[in-house]
Every structure is written in C-alpha cells, then in structure tokens.
Amino acid sequence: MNTSLIEITVAEIKELADVEPKQASKRFELIATTMNDEQLVEVIEKMDIVTLTQINSHHDISCPSIMSELMTPEQIRDIVCQQPLYWEEKIKNNAEELIQHTFDFLTYLIRIQDSEEKQTAILECIAEDPAGLFYLSIPFIEMMLGEGHDDEDHINDYYDDEEDTDTIGYDSRVASEEAHSFSLDDPRSLMALIHELAPDVEKAIKNLLRNESSGWETIINKFVNELVIQAKEKNQVTDEYAEVDDMFSFLD
C-alpha cells in the first residue's frame, strides 16, 4: 500500500472518529484485514492523539483490538492521559463509575498485549507521567482507602513494605498466583499483575495514595480534576507547537 493510500485511510478514519467514534473503531478493524502490521502501524502513527483516544475509548472492550495491540507504550500512555477529557458527565461525577471505567479501560489496554514485556513497558510508561499515575491509581482507591478496609491488617497488606519494593509476606510467587486466581473483573487481579510485572509502579501507586488523608470519593474527585487540568495543559502545548510548525511550513 503506497503512502497516498495510507493517508487516505487515515483521513477516512479521522473523519469518521469525529462524528461516530464507535463506527471508526469498527472501520479500523475491518481495514486491518486488508493490511499487514507494518502498514497498520504507519496508519496509527499518522493519527493524532485525539483520534486515537476517541477510537480506543469507544471500542467494544469485550472484543480484541488490533489497534491497541499495535500501539506503542507511549501512544497508550498518551491515550490514558487524554481520555478524561472525553468522559461523560455520568462517569466523571460518579466515583464508583470512575473506578469501574478506569479499571475496565486499563485492563483492556494492558491484558490484550501478547507479551509480558510490553505489558510491563506500558505500565511503566503510564506511571512515569504524573497524570498517568493518577489514572492508574483510581481503580484501587476504594479498595485501599475505603471504609471497611481501614483495619490494621489491611493497612499492612497494602502499605507495609520491605525495602519499599515488596509487601510483607507477598513475594513474587504469591503475586504470580494471585494474578491468575482473581477473576479478570476484580481490581485485585490488575493490582496483582502490576505487582508481578512492575513492582516500581505498584510502589508509586501506594506512595501516591499513602499521602492522601481524605475520604476515597474526595480523593477520586481530586484526581479527576488533576487529570482534566493536565490533559488540557498538554493540549495547549501541542497546539502551540502546531502553530509554530504552520508558521514555518512554507520552508518545507
């Protein structure tokens, strides 16, 4: 497939994503049957982050996603950090909905990958971004800080670290077992996977939550506000760079 056809495909998907993101997702999956991975990667690379976010946010997460499998950890991180701008009000204003939504989206993006190496790279890449770490933490806030989970044993389970890497009595063997024993719709399954693949990310999540003293719903609202603010700031910087590029486009 030549460059012009790649660009036509990108334009078609983008135009559809602007009005019917779910249909754009289905269209991409259909087009994927006519291209090889190298061509699909080129299509993805030419899409802007807004289009990628819209498509992935509206993909049926019960079905495999070729796009998510082919995206780089950096692209997935950018989608995660951008997605809060597109949350519906019924999600954004409901703490329990947010927990479920962020958990489902992270599970979909991470577990669809075909190797533990890429899963690890995605987790580490997301956690390196302050907004990404906020997003990663949301599915576990009620589990770690909610009422009924504040007894001493529970606090030790989540916060008592040995050398700030492993929870007491929670070695890698147990983590591996737990990663496969919880049902995939249980947030503990994702936390067990993070513990197994990216212990530094688990540590970062725990440190972030350790510094919070408010109720879990208040903390979620705070994190959501931070996510939206940071996403808008990133968009502003991106727009400014785009304006500069346009100013000097005549030199190309």
Swiss-Prot record:
Keywords assigned by UniProt?
Answer: Stress response
Task: Please report what switches on or represses expression of this protein.
Answer: Part of the atcJABC operon. The operon is constitutively expressed, and expression shows only a very slight increase at low temperature.
Per the record, the domain of life is Bacteria
Q: What happens when the gene is disrupted?
A: Deletion of the gene leads to a dramatically reduced growth at low temperature.
Query: What job does this protein perform?
Result: Involved in cold adaptation. Directly interacts with the RNA polymerase and decreases its activity. May direct the DnaK chaperone to the RNA polymerase to sustain life at low temperatures. Overproduction prevents bacterial growth due to RNA polymerase inhibition.
**Subunit details:** Interacts with AtcC, but not with AtcA and AtcJ. Interacts with the RNA polymerase subunits RpoB and RpoC.
Protein's name according to its UniProt entry:
Adaptation to cold protein B
